[in-house]
Structure formats: C-alpha cells, structure tokens
C-alpha cells in the first residue's frame, strides 16, 4: 500500500509579531514561534494515523533551514488600535490513534480570549472527527495565541501551527 508523504511526528507552536509593516509582523510571529527558517506549506486538517505528538524542543532539531515543511496554520493580523486578535489550532485524537486519523482545525478571530479561542478550535476538531467516525475523540487539545494591537496601530500578527515532520 502506497503511503507517500505521511508525517511521522507533529509539534505545536505559536507566536506573535509586531511591526509597522504587515509582512514583517508575520515574520516576527514566525520567529517567535521558532519556524521562520523553513519554507512552510499549509495543508488541510488531517492528523495522520500513528503520528506521534512531540514537544517543539524535540521536533525543531529534526528540521533543516530551508526545508519544505508542511503545517496546519492559523493566522490573524490587524493594525486597528486596541483590537484583540486570536489564532488557534484544535486537535482531536481518535481513540485508536495508531489505526485511525484525527483532525486539526484552524480558528482565527477577533475579540476572543486565548482560552475561548482555543476551546472553540478544539471543539471544531472534535466535531469534524465525530461527523466522520460517529465517535467522540480519545483526547482533544489546542494551542492558541492572542495579542492586542498597540495604540500606535502597528501591525500585529498571531499564529498557531501544527508542524509536521516526515
């Protein structure tokens, strides 16, 4: 059976960046998350079967600067003073994660707390898994980042990401 590019590991990270330019605020968020050195390719929301969730500190050394790296990423930016922005990734892990795939969800919003945005993303992933399997997940989790735009209206970007390791 052909498996192609199926990730063996995944780690979660998030970051915030601020700059007068929108693109540079995104770069600063990538740096804060520790994933600025890679050519990131966003993919949709499947957590492969038998994909081990590892800590960022374990996953990052497995990647090489300039490497093409697949990620599920949530991103939000604003330059509206005092605007709160959020970016979250939810994860629903099936009861048998060795045999079955799970779901990852992206949620980006305005005005929500980090906790609320994270729980919302987690619930999205749980619902996506349930509509496919008709079973509740074995475990759910999320990673979120929120920030408030400064009074000067500098661009602020938040990201949350599930980063795959092949």
From Swiss-Prot:
Cofactor(s) listed: pyruvate
Any one GO biological process: arginine catabolic process
GO molecular function, one term: arginine decarboxylase activity
Keyword Lipoprotein: no
Cofactor note: Binds 1 pyruvoyl group covalently per subunit.
Enzyme class: lyase
Entry coiled-coil feature ranges: none
Catalyzed reactions: L-arginine + H(+) = agmatine + CO2
Location of Pyruvic acid (Ser) modifications: 45
Stored Pfam families: PvlArgDC
InterPro entries tied to this protein: Pyr-dep_his/arg-deCO2ase (IPR016104), Pyr-dep_his/arg-deCO2ase_sand (IPR016105), Pyruvoyl-dep_arg_deCO2ase (IPR002724)
UniProt EC number: 4.1.1.19
Tagged with keyword rRNA-binding: no
Descriptive protein name: Pyruvoyl-dependent arginine decarboxylase
Species whose genome carries this gene: Methanocella arvoryzae (strain DSM 22066 / NBRC 105507 / MRE50)
Lineage of producing organism: Archaea, Methanobacteriati, Methanobacteriota, Stenosarchaea group, Methanomicrobia
């Amino acid at each position: 059976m052909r498996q192609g590019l199926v990730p063996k590991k995944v780690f979660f990270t998030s970051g915030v960046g601020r700059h007068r330019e929108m693109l540079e605020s995104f770069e600063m968020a990538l740096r804060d998350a520790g994933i600025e050195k890679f050519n990131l390719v966003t993919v949709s929301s499947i957590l492969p079967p038998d994909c081990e969730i590892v800590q960022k500190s374990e996953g990052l050394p497995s990647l090489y600067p300039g490497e093409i790296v697949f990620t599920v990423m949530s991103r939000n930016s604003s330059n509206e003073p005092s605007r709160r922005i959020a970016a979250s990734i939810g994860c629903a892990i099936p009861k048998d994660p060795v045999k079955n795939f799970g779901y990852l969800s992206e949620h980006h919003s305005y005005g929500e707390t980090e906790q609320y945005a994270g729980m919302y993303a987690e619930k999205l992933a749980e619902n996506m898994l349930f509509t496919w399997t008709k079973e509740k997940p074995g475990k759910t989790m999320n990673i979120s980042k929120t920030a408030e735009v400064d009074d000067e209206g500098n661009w602020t970007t938040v990201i949350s990401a599930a980063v795959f390791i092949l």
